[in-house]
Amino acid sequence: NTGQCIPLNIIAQEFVDYVKSHDLDPEKTLLWMVSSQIACNIGMFPHHLRSLLNSYGKGMEKAQVYVGAMSFMDISLRLPINTYFAYMFGGLIRKIGCRIRPYEKKMGTTDRVIQEGVDILVDAFLGKRSKEEALADVISSFQRIEISSERKPKVAIFGDLYVRDNDVMNQDLIRFIESHNGEVIVTPYSAYAQMIARAYLKKWFFEGRYLEVLSSKALLATVTRMQKTYQKHFGKILENPAPQYDEDPERILSEYHVRIEHTGESMDNLLKIFYIK
């Protein structure tokens, strides 16, 4: 790796492994990578992946790297919305798990319900049943878990985007905190996107990237309206109504002498700290 927050060598290796395990012709395959000018030097990711595949050889140099929009709008108009809700559902299920597991009376119950819930929601995203119906069933299962009334110190996890919720990379940090009598606060990526959206929209406007601003604002408005249907179910266990992330980012950042023109996870984390404190 060359210092990126996302280990590109792992992405390239997983692509190679997938092509091999499914006996695909590399010349007829594409590795998707985001086109972006945000932090972490993401703009060079496609080029570096191309170099990694060329270096690997063995036919993989014939595979292509497809540079696509972060929203996936160039693939399908429905895909950005489904992607957002996949992150929302997954993130909030993880948050519920962290809320309940430290207090469960029968150890292992929460993890079992999480796994069963994920399986149910996968079917919903595959179109086999209604998402709202599936979510209602999952939340009911969580509500049936017997828990104690004690309260433990809460610990929020900050840090690198890739490592924060990756149990392998962070060495099972959540279980470590829970084993030392803590309750972990995690942030779903859907909430994280809402927290930082206003700052990036302003930044892109200043940079003259008006099309990105318009398309992103339209997508944000759509998912914000649609998620109210699902939030009422999550609200039976988590906060209801859902938190609002509509404070002026310039005011928040100015306390730390950071400007809208700055970018990166340090800026993002300042906004996150403000909203979850």
Could you tell me what each predicted segment is?
Residues 1-277:
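An N-terminal assembly and electron-transfer interface module characteristic of large anaerobic redox
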